[in-house]
């Protein structure tokens, strides 16, 4: 049985053994460990994950791929090393899901690029979080997440995307992946991205003050980046009273002319702790 990639599902099937090895190496997988794979497609990555001795839960939206995988991995399914689920991961409530995601777990996947943001939000901002991720994403997205220092200044420029990841874990750019590593090849370069040590411990002080502190945090961050040319403080006046900001800026000793892109993840956490 053979299936062809569906453009509507953003499918690009991995065909590179070298990239596969890079993903498995970055995953640092232990035998018996729980792995969640999203969009297994033809099962190339699934097979490599199973060879490590890991227990894999693979969630596939495409019924054609699901049937192919069910046949291809019949033995692993029977031995319960692989649990194959037909469904849309973005619609699954991981806490009450019928496939009962075992924890702790790692998320390792070649995801459709158009849902990268939604995947990061779902698995970083909500329980149960993976302890780490290894994802194939667009290179441009990986660059933005890691926000590596600019050659001219030696400083990195943060974005909503990079902050959204770094407050939960540590991202690493593992490797650039050319279009030819996929069938069909995408029109852009890709990258293997890992996010290590995922947790919400950075939000401890914020959550102690407000159980919905993570939502409030991102409300503040989004406001801070609302107008790129404006100063951070001016942007925040959209959602916080000027008098409150004046007091917080004074107490924290912040530069009046600082911009959102120059604020580090810890700066944001400290700011919201003072505001909440």
Predicted regions and their residues:
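Catalytic cores of RNA-modifying enzymes
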Residues: 1-219, 243, 261, 271
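C-terminal lobe and adjacent flexible extensions of AdoMet/dcAdoMet transferase-like proteins
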Residues: 197, 223-276
